[in-house]
């Protein structure tokens, strides 16, 4: 994020943030977004392209971009990087088969220049499912402790029950606002 972007955001009376939600297909990105927004989650289908939701939370205006995670769509992810304040990486904790794919895709995002400085929240989703990897196990598999380029946090959650979605989002907002916004 450039200096002009930071200065512009400091002057804004309305605290507006751009959050980019990415992850492999079927990780639960759209379900998290809908649950957070209080919408029905019974009829969710794979995202072919992207969804944008604008939500108000804790005095912030959040523009959340939920981008499809199918392999055929991942090359388009870079089209959404510009002006991103926070990156939400969603992991299907029950999908042990694709953890290496998940790790590889996350690592490729972290070297993107246009995401430099963006705060990273990793949602270890589907904690309600039997056999789901714990947050600590995912932390190891994804090699999160090696991340030095971004502030990050991993939060175990369930998009279906809504458990731990708010603490994750609140951490993200606290971290972003401590970097971007000045005290009033």
UniProtKB/Swiss-Prot annotation:
Residues with a covalently attached lipid (N-myristoyl glycine): 2
Molecular function in Gene Ontology: GDP binding; GTP binding; GTPase activity
Binding positions (GTP): 23-30, 66-70, 125-128
GO terms of biological process kind: bicellular tight junction assembly; centrosome cycle; maintenance of protein location in nucleus; negative regulation of GTPase activity; positive regulation of cell-substrate adhesion; positive regulation of microtubule polymerization; protein folding; regulation of aerobic respiration
Any Gene Ontology CC annotation: mitochondrial intermembrane space
InterPro entries noted in UniProt: Arl2, ARL2/3, P-loop_NTPase, Small_GTP-bd, Small_GTPase_ARF/SAR
Xref: Gene3D superfamilies: P-loop containing nucleotide triphosphate hydrolases (3.40.50.300)
Pfam family, one: Arf
Residue ranges that the Swiss-Prot or TrEMBL entry lists as coiled coil: none
Keywords from the named record: Cataract, Cell cycle, Cytoplasm, Cytoskeleton, Disease variant, GTP-binding, Isopeptide bond, Lipoprotein, Mitochondrion, Myristate, Nucleotide-binding, Nucleus, Phosphoprotein, Ubl conjugation
Cross-link (Glycyl lysine isopeptide (Lys-Gly) (interchain with G-Cter in ubiquitin)): 71
Effect on the protein of changing residue 7 to D: Reduces interaction with ARL2BP
Transmembrane segments: none
Superkingdom field: Eukaryota
Oligomer and partners: Found in a complex with ARL2, ARL2BP and SLC25A6. Found in a complex with at least ARL2, PPP2CB, PPP2R1A, PPP2R2A, PPP2R5E and TBCD. Found in a complex with ARL2, ARL2BP and SLC25A4. The GTP-bound form interacts with PDE6D. Interacts with ELMOD2. The GTP-bound form interacts with ARL2BP. Interacts, preferentially in its GDP-bound state, with TBCD. Interacts with UNC119.
PANTHER family: ADP-RIBOSYLATION FACTOR-LIKE PROTEIN 2-RELATED (PTHR45697)
Family: Belongs to the small GTPase superfamily. Arf family.
Disease: Microcornea, rod-cone dystrophy, cataract, and posterior staphyloma 1: An autosomal dominant ocular disorder characterized by poor visual acuity in early childhood, due to congenital cataract and microcornea followed by rod-cone dystrophy, with later development of posterior staphyloma.
Function, in words: Small GTP-binding protein which cycles between an inactive GDP-bound and an active GTP-bound form, and the rate of cycling is regulated by guanine nucleotide exchange factors (GEF) and GTPase-activating proteins (GAP). GTP-binding protein that does not act as an allosteric activator of the cholera toxin catalytic subunit. Regulates formation of new microtubules and centrosome integrity. Prevents the TBCD-induced microtubule destruction. Participates in association with TBCD, in the disassembly of the apical junction complexes.
Protein name: ADP-ribosylation factor-like protein 2
Species name: Homo sapiens (Human)
């Amino acid at each position: 994020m450039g200096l002009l972007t930071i200065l512009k955001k400091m002057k804004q009376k309305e605290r507006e943030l751009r959050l980019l939600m990415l992850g492999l297909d079927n990780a639960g990105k759209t379900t998290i977004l809908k649950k957070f927004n209080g919408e029905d989650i019974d009829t969710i289908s794979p995202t072919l392209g992207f969804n944008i939701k604008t939500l108000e939370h804790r005095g912030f205006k959040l523009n959340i971009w939920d981008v499809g995670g199918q392999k055929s769509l991942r090359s388009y992810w870079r089209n959404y990087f510009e002006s991103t304040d926070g990156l939400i990486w969603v992991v299907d904790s029950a999908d042990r088969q694709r953890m290496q794919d998940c790790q590889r895709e996350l690592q490729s995002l972290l070297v993107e220049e246009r995401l430099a400085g963006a705060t990273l929240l990793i949602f270890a989703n589907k904690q309600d499912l039997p056999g789901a990897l714990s947050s600590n196990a995912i932390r190891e598999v994804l090699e999160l402790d090696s991340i030095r380029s971004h502030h990050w946090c991993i939060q175990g959650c369930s998009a279906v029950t809504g458990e731990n979605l708010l603490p994750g989002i609140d951490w993200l907002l606290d971290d972003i606002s401590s970097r971007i916004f000045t005290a009033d």
